């Protein structure tokens, strides 16, 4: 296998390993590492937990420091190794100490604390460093992290459940409260896994008033996102379940809300821009929008969205609130059947241009039997 072909092969493996940390690394980037000697992987690792071992450490701790294979090994790291003391020591120093002669990096880290210094440190120690910048797979892998650093806002994912006849909210009696599901249980479980991937989850006041959702991840593993409610007219109840979250945020609201709820001033610019600005300033890298048609249309009209996941259930509702229309130019990344349901993945063309491209999606959970 030619060296360039081998480099790409092992880097693709590092990218795949990095995805193992997608639920617990935020606000850090996702990083994978493969240590290769000859044509064999001798160790693999990934950054699994914010504040925990970085990918290089996770891989190298599987090998004895005196392992002779390290003297001819190549370390494939999906993102430039860090060169600063944070919650963990610099990964550059460990690579140097272990005597690895060659390091292949998926992309340079734009974080100002790194920004090429890791590559310089390794080269200064006599290590051959190959940088595969232009690897858009690496940019897509860390699109949340990069959006915060390069665009100054969280990555925005919109999710909508749609009936086959085009409705997003089935008819219900006025006094009924609680969600009336359009999709089946397996897809709702997948939605909870999507929630765990994002740092915040946003809904409108209507969703809270009608459904009183918990917006948690009870059917999946991973951290619960910070709930954000758009409530400019103070419609939501202080006893709503979302306000039990210790970091709950509301744009608007009223004075009767629990004291711990962060209330954003409605005079501080347009609603969506104001909320995204607040989330960015608090270190939030991504937000999942599960609001109703009015809220989703607001994001479409503002242009401040990146991905849209349209989940079509199996049964027509015969009426209700029409689902939002996807903007002209939205790029279909892929479509998957999921049990009785069907999921379509779209990306904002401007977001696709910024990332470089949008790879075909993979589902976060196994397909139901």
Residue ranges of predicted features:
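Enzymes that bind and transform nitrogen-containing heteroaromatic metabolites
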Residues: 2-29, 87, 155-369
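A broad detector of short, well-ordered amphipathic alpha-helices
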Residues: 12, 16-19, 43, 54-57, ...
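Helix-turn-helix
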Residues: 32
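Zn2+-dependent cytidine deaminase-like catalytic core
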Residues: 35-137, 300
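Active-site beta-strand termini and strand-to-loop segments that position acidic
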Residues: 37-38, 150-151, 347-349
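Structured loop/turn residues at beta-strand edges in well-structured enzyme cores
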Residues: 68-71, 98, 151, 196, ...
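Flexible, polar/acidic helix-loop-strand segments at domain edges
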Residues: 142-153
């Amino acid at each position: 296998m030619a060296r360039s072909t081998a480099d790409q092969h092992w880097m693709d493996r590092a990218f795949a390993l990095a995805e193992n940390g997608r639920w617990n690394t935020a606000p850090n980037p996702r990083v994978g590492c493969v240590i290769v000697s000859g044509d064999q992987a001798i160790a693999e690792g990934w950054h699994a937990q914010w504040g925990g071992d970085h990918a290089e450490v996770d891989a190298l701790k599987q090998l004895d420091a005196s392992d002779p294979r390290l003297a001819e090994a190549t370390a494939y790291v999906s993102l430039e190794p860090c060169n600063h003391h944070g919650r963990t020591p610099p990964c550059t120093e460990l690579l140097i100490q272990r005597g690895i002669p060659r390091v292949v990096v998926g992309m340079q880290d734009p974080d100002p604390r790194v920004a090429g210094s890791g590559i310089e440190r390794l080269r200064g120690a006599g290590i051959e460093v190959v940088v595969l910048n232009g690897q858009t797979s690496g940019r897509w892998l860390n699109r949340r992290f990069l959006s915060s650093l390069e665009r100054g806002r969280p990555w925005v994912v919109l999710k909508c459940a749609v009936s086959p006849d085009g409705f997003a909210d089935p008819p219900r009696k006025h006094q009924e409260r609680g969600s009336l599901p359009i999709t089946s249980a397996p897809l709702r479980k997948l939605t909870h896994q999507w929630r765990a991937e994002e740092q915040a989850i946003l809904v409108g006041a209507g969703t809270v008033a009608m459904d009183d959702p918990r917006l948690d991840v009870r059917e999946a593993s991973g951290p619960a996102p910070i709930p954000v409610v758009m409530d400019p007219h103070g419609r939501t109840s202080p006893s709503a379940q979302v306000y039990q979250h210790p970091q709950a945020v509301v744009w608007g609201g009223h004075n009767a809300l629990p004291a711990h709820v962060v209330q954003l001033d409605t005079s501080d610019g347009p609603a969506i821009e104001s909320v995204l600005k607040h989330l960015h300033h608090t270190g939030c890298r991504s937000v999942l929008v599960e609001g109703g048609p009015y809220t989703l249309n607001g994001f479409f009209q503002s242009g401040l969205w990146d991905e849209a996941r349209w989940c079509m259930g199996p049964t027509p509702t015969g009426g209700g609130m029409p689902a939002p229309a996807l903007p002209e130019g939205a790029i279909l990344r892929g479509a998957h059947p999921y049990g009785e349901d069907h999921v379509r993945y779209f990306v904002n063309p401007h977001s696709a241009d910024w990332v470089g491209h949008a790879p075909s999606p993979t589902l976060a959970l196994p397909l139901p039997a």
